[in-house]
């Protein structure tokens, strides 16, 4: 049987029971996740570490408790880049100190206007720091209490500051590394400015001349944020899908930024995208729609090697497991093994359909994570 026919058959097996499952879900009572459920299927073991962590299934809270703002995500990478650029002209620990220590901003300004460092690359580094550290009160959000939702008053940069940085970027012609960093700061400052939407045309005009490194996709994330602020969700979702597909370290963040739309709109949007970005788009759509199996199968029809099926498959298994473990969760007496097997049979045939999974598990070697498919198939068998 060909791969396409197998996936098509899996679709049929899934949809044949969809009505029953939807009815039981709509009429059932799903209590808050106040109790910890023991799991025999740990997604962080079967899926590459850190790639989808907070997108794994949890009923009332994020997987592993919460999602923090990982402000240190790029700290070491950015430090390494600047150390390589500056070379031996400035010690590594001084570079780290100037980039990240809270009280270093005054020192940056003093060094910038002194004659201690005459090396051109060090001067560029100090110019970069003058921009980033000089505006971090606003770009870093340190001026408000993140837990005070009632009295949050966002500050914005005056338009003159991003315009100044943009002018500096446009004047740079010979130093690609420095120009790329200043370009990113221009994008960033426009996002935090009084004219946030100005980041969109600037990115569209200049992005093609930039290397597609982490700064490129971080800049794209700001543009997606500007579209979200304008409620232009289709445009935002396209950018978020590209980031989700290309930048694993941002998948959790963009997954939460995504705004689900009706499937017909997503299908229209997806037609113009590359297969990888289409898969990412459907993966995020599946995260929000409570029907992981359907979107998982959509992805497999586009690219059977797509890694984005992985967190959807783990969510499907963990949701089913949550229904199976009612005895464990609430301390209900398990009157007999037979009663448990009857309950498990009902969950796996009426509340959830698993025939499609068993079918695809036999073909697991053809997918991106054969181990996950075999373990999932064995779990529901």
For the regions a protein language model found, what residue spans apply to each?
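Bacterial N-terminal signal peptides that target proteins for export
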Residues: 2-10
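Bacterial N-terminal signal peptides
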Residues: 10-19
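Extracytoplasmic/secretory-pathway proteins
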Residues: 22-188, 193-381
């Amino acid at each position: 049987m060909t791969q396409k026919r197998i996936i098509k058959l899996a679709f049929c097996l899934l949809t044949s029971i969809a009505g029953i499952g939807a009815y039981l879900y709509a009429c059932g009572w799903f209590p808050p996740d106040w109790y910890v459920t023991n799991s025999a299927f740990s997604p962080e073991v079967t899926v590459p570490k850190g790639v989808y962590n907070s997108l794994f299934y949890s009923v009332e809270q994020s997987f592993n408790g919460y999602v923090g703002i990982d402000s240190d995500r790029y700290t070491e990478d950015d430090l390494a880049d600047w150390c390589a650029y500056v070379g031996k002209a400035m010690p590594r620990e001084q570079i780290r100190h100037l980039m990240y220590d809270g009280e270093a901003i005054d020192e940056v300004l003093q060094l910038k206007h002194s004659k201690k460092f005459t090396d051109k690359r060090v001067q560029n580094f100090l110019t970069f720091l003058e921009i980033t550290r000089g505006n971090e009160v606003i770009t870093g959000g340190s001026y408000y209490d993140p837990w005070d939702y009632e009295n949050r008053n966002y500050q914005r940069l005056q338009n003159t500051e991003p315009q100044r940085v943009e002018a500096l970027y446009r004047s740079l012609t010979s130093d690609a590394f420095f120009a790329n960093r200043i370009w990113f700061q221009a994008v960033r400052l426009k996002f935090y400015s009084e004219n946030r939407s100005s980041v969109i045309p600037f990115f569209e005009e200049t992005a093609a001349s930039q290397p597609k490194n982490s700064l490129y996709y971080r800049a794209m994330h700001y543009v997606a944020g500007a579209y979200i602020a304008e409620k232009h969700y289709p445009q935002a979702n396209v950018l978020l899908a590209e980031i989700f597909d290309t930048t694993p370290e941002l998948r959790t963040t963009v997954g939460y930024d995504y705004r689900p739309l009706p499937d017909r709109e997503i299908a229209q949007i997806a037609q113009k995208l590359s297969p990888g970005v289409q898969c990412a788009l459907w993966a995020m759509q599946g995260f929000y729609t409570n029907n992981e199996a359907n979107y998982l199968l959509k992805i497999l029809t586009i690219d059977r090697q797509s890694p984005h099926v992985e967190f959807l498959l783990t969510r499907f298994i963990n949701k089913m497991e949550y229904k199976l473990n009612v005895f464990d969760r609430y301390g209900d007496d398990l009157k007999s093994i037979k009663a448990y097997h009857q309950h498990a049979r009902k969950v796996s045939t009426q509340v959830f359909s698993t025939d499609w999974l068993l079918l695809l598990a036999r073909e697991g070697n053809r997918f991106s994570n054969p181990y996950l498919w075999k373990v999932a198939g064995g779990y529901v068998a």
